[in-house]
Each structure stands twice: as structure tokens, then as C-alpha cells.
Amino acid sequence: FNSSGCSIQDSKIAYKMNTEEKISLPKKPDQKVDVRSTFKINSDLTVKGFSEKTEWVPEIDNSYIFDKKTTLSILAGFEHDRRVIIQGYHGTGKSTHIEQVAARLNWPCIRINLDSHVSRLDLLGKDAIKLEDGKQITKFVEGILPWSIQNPVALVFDEYDAGRPDVMFVIQRILEVEGKLTLLDQNRVLRPHSNFRLFATTNTIGMGDSTGLYHGTQQINQGQMDR
């Protein structure tokens, strides 16, 4: 996995995956989190979360102030397994908002920046040369996407409107109702973990950029937006 498009935290995950080091995560949420007291917004809702904080959970910023409407949308994604996309201008804290919600739910979170360096192989996986018993062998190394959907993690795609077309069609597979991911090269069909969550952030509304502010952004396939 090419870690050039992800955060330092996610580079650690990529390293562990490439070295086949076991990544330990809790399997399911085991507590309820009160929205009013946790996020300081006027709501009587409770949402599920984890009591155990792992190294893959973002650090809490105690000074962070939560916008009510955006926070409730993100919480709906966590609680009801909804795909959530957040649109806004650069520097408005879209990704940070998702991370800070995840931090208070102790929900493992991975961020991937969909710039031009992230390829289809980075997401799905590729053959790599490994050393076993003193011999070099070719072995398939799973990408970040197959690993993520099989675990209770929140996967965040930053700059969603800058993704390459081949990458976007890979992502479209997991936007379906059942969210299955087919790995044709491996003859495998992966079903998502019941606590896998998917989020995205974007600068535009999916119709491309006519302002000149966001060079490199693309129009998002309407089939994806409908999902």
C-alpha cells in the first residue's frame, strides 16, 4: 500500500499489513454514548461506541466545537451504517470533524487522501516479493480497502472529488446496499464487517469545479452520488 495519500496513523496500518503483523481491534461496540454530554449539542440521542481505545482511534481535541447538523449526520453514519459525504470549502475541518466524532466513540478511523498517487492496486492489493524460509516468493498483499471492510473501522476518503476514475469505480462497489467487494484476481467476494463505516469529504458538490479554486477535481459519477 502506497502511504503517500494517507495520514501517519494510516501509514502504520499499511506497514503492519505489508509485514503481516497482526492488527488487534475490538469486534463490536459495547457501550452507549450520550450525545448531549459528549458532543455538547442539544439532542437526547445515544449512539453506540467502544469502551476500549486502541492505537487506531484519533486523539481527542478537547477544544473542538461541534456543529450540530454536521455532527448528527456523521453520528447517523456510525449508528445506522449510512454512507456519509461532507462537502465544504478547504480548511473548514471536514475530515477533522469525522475524526473527532470517531475519537469520542473510540471508533478506529483510517483516512485516505484520494489524490492522483492513489491507484486501484493501492486500494485492492497487489503481488509483492516476500522472503519465506530464506527464499523469495511472490505473494498477494491485501490493500487497505479489503482489510478495512473486514474490520470495525471508519474509512474516510478525503478529496473524494479528486479521485481517479478507475479508483472511483472500485469504491462504487462498496456503496451498494450489501456493500460486497469482489476481488477478481483472488476469486474472492468480501462481505463488509457489521461495524465497518464509510465516509467521504469533498470540496465540490460532485459537478466539477467552475470557480478555478479546486484544480484537479472531477465530476462524480451520478450513480455514486445516488448511493
Predicted regions and their residues:
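N-terminal amphipathic/basic-hydrophobic helices that include classical n-h-c signal peptides
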Residues: F1-K16
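AAA+ P-loop NTPase catalytic core and its hallmark functional loops
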Residues: Y15-R227
